[in-house]
Design a protein with these regions (language model features):
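C-terminal interaction modules
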Residues: 1-8, 14-20, 40-44, 91-95, ...
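N-terminal domain-start segments of secreted/luminal proteins
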Residues: 18-56, 60-65, 69-72, 85-91, ...
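His/acidic/aromatic-lined binding-pocket segments of jelly-roll/cupin-type domains
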Residues: 23-25, 54-56, 72, 97-98, ...
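A short, compositionally biased
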Residues: 26-30, 57-60, 115-116, 155-164, ...
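Flexible glycine-/small-residue-rich
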Residues: 27, 76, 100, 133, ...
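Short, small-residue-rich packing micro-motifs
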Residues: 55-64, 73-122, 163-165
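Tight coil/turn sites that cap or link beta-strands
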Residues: 69, 76-79, 125-126, 133-134, ...
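Long, low-complexity intrinsically disordered regions
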Residues: 114-136
């Protein structure tokens, strides 16, 4: 009886962040779902997200807004796993671990990356990305090969900048700090390719930026042109 009471007390003291809602589906078009343990939960705008969830799309797209202002955009036939999310600014605690395991996922930094960047791990099957408060997109193929591209970041006032990321495997690391600079990784045992600037036509820039122009990321067409101009200045 005393042992049972001890177990119950220990369970009551488990961090609530393990089961708390850490964000929600802010936009969805077409079919998508949330894998939660052994359950598959149909998703839509307003669906709550928990740590250890996996967001999956088939012929749809999804955007998730986290409570620390981190945002991820997930395109068709993609999967994003939320391995860990802890955000407690009152106690100066924050950590985030995500894995893009298939398809195309765009990541935009929130408060955790800005305040606790050492506690942020963004992964693909073949690479780990170190984040220093910026946006980037990951494209992951069926065997885990990954293309990581750094993107310009713009606020709702139209102010744009390019941050910096590191892309690392067991065999090496590269640093990227120019908009539309990209590197590829085939396996975790091979080094990333040297970063190169992508020479992109206008429609491909639109695709890589994953159409945030209809969300608060960029308010109007003029601000949208500013964002693309920053990228094209480097290509």
């Amino acid at each position: 009886m005393q042992f049972a009471r001890y177990i119950l007390t220990a369970l009551l003291w488990l961090p609530i962040t393990a089961y708390a809602n850490i964000g929600q589906v802010a936009d969805q078009k077409g079919n998508g779902a949330i894998e939660r343990g052994r359950d598959l939960v149909g998703s839509g705008v307003g669906t709550e997200i928990q740590s250890m969830d996996a967001a999956v799309t088939t012929n749809g797209t999804m955007r998730i807004d986290f409570i620390d202002d981190t945002r991820v955009d997930i395109t068709q036939h993609s999967k994003l796993i939320i391995d860990e999310f802890v955000f407690d600014p009152a106690n100066d605690i924050g950590s985030l671990s995500l894995k893009a395991s298939l398809g195309t996922v765009r990541y935009a930094s929130g408060q955790i990356a800005k305040k606790y960047k050492q506690n942020v791990k963004i992964r693909t099957p073949s690479a780990t990305i170190g984040v220093r408060g910026t946006d980037f997109v990951m494209v992951v193929d069926e065997v885990g090969g990954s293309l990581i591209t750094l993107l310009p970041s713009c606020d709702s006032a139209g102010n744009c900048y390019t941050g910096e990321i590191t892309v690392e495997t067991d065999a090496g690391m590269v640093i990227m700090n120019q908009a539309f600079q990209a590197t590829a990784t085939q396996t975790s045992s091979q080094p990333p390719t040297p970063p190169r600037l992508l020479d992109l036509p206008e429609d491909m820039i639109d695709a890589l930026l994953i159409v945030r122009k209809k969300t608060p990321w960029v308010e109007d067409e003029e601000e949208w042109k500013k964002a693309k101009k920053i990228g094209r200045a480097h290509v």
